[in-house]
């Protein structure tokens, strides 16, 4: 028994000394649940036997009722741990895609521009390999030298006709040093290349709905996301590895689960009639200065259109994302994981495979705010002209040059980006 106790204590000490992000990655690893259940049952069996043995040795002075009480106390934490992990497993299976299928073939997607601008558009044709998961050797990251995520903020709901992706950010992470480049795409871009010459002549935030309305033209389980991925790939010149569509309710719940976010607010932002999580409405005010924002305040801050322009709102969105990346502690994320995933089950859609999650968690754990660059790809610096009616046309060649430079390891300023520490005062 002493030997078993020593093994248990040693194992517990080893686990306690592991980095939290490593434990979080293990918890999210497919197949880990079965092993943890076996370990949990084995430890429970040993503790129950030790309890019974101690009771039997002293049975002359204690009654059976005390054995039942002791066994209940012994069993409770194990049952709680099993229930908690089961909840995580079920939520992960509902939110994230099935494990990836390895493949080495790609199908090129050619894009062309269809709109008629008042200024000349970029004439280059862009060919991007279709998204696949390449076979990797042991120890190699599934996405290779860099991970490109398309983060979408949607405002679909019972009072909306379809999903409008009013927040669109390309987050590119270098595998070598976890340097992050965030490219924010204005929702009013027009005259951009479109996959396979499909008939489309609207602004960028209408692409997702177009894909939903024409599922036969696009691949995958989410034709809206597939359509938007194709457009974004043509604009940035890089393959999008995965997308994440976050309903704004999920954003609110996520900020709360992580304990809020702290950031400098350069100008007071108001949101009259803001709807709180409980459905009531208030006139929300986020005052100038360094502020601790909960989920409601953060959502009002990134969605308000009362002050400034759409581009100012995009700046706020990027800064909140950078602050969350910088401040989200792995330990807090581990504790908040059940509530996070519970909130995401019905409000997040993604094609990230479950077996890739541990690698992403490990990569993002190394984020350093000094290596985070931000830019809004809007006029005047990043546009090539205007569509009649005042719609900006993206300067595709320049955008692709900036994205390539960032992924090649150029400092943010050299790639045309602004360091988050400068842009957001973090």
Predicted regions mapped to residue ranges:
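Short intrinsically disordered, low-complexity coil segments enriched in acidic
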Residues: 2-17, 176, 399-403, 414
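Generic hydrophobic/packing signal
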Residues: 52, 56-59, 208, 236
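Structural motif marking the loop-to-transmembrane transition
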Residues: 3, 31-35, 62-66, 333, ...
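Internal/C-terminal transmembrane anchor helices
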Residues: 60-90
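Hydrophobic residues in alpha-helical membrane-spanning segments
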Residues: 20, 76-78, 395
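Non-catalytic, solvent-exposed segments at the cell envelope interface
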Residues: 28, 84-426
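Membrane-embedded alpha-helical segments of integral membrane proteins
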Residues: 3-57
